[in-house]
Amino acid sequence: LKSKDLINWEHSTVNFPTRYTKEWKNVIRVWAPETIYDKKAGKYMVFYSLRTSDPGSFDKIYYQYANEDFTDLEGEPKWLFDAGNATIDGDIVYNENDQLYHLFYKQESGRGIFQAVAKNLTDRWRMLDGNVEQTKEAVEGVGVCKAIDGKSWIIMYDCYGSGHYQFCKSTDLKTFEFVQN
């Protein structure tokens, strides 16, 4: 979606099976798209979870760059990250303190929200140990943003079995403190 006034919106669609008729013809889902500005490439990266119906396939995070007027995607999907099993709901932020990109994601087999880091967006991502969420509930849909104080981060995720979001706070993106449901 694109808007000049946040009231009227223009909609663009990319149908993967009809647009990419060779390698991506068996796509069964593309979901949880997010964007981040790639300073190195000088354009917006759109990243999303994608799965095909091919044998042995599982959800992985792929990316493409948006065109200049943000109405289409350039090129074919490129692999960005997976944890070796279904990996969905990615969100990426850049932390100026450690000069790393932090990818937060749901790992289906690990049951929870995990994190990986990279120096550049398209580098190989290094998985970090431990869960991010501060609950035993099933979670998904992680979102991360800078707090209004400009010094800390807010991490939120959907506790989908209970019908609420939970919020945590972090000053270093390594340790996470429960704030509220």
Sequence positions of predicted segments:
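Beta-rich carbohydrate-recognition and catalytic domains
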Residues: 1-30, 36-138, 147-181
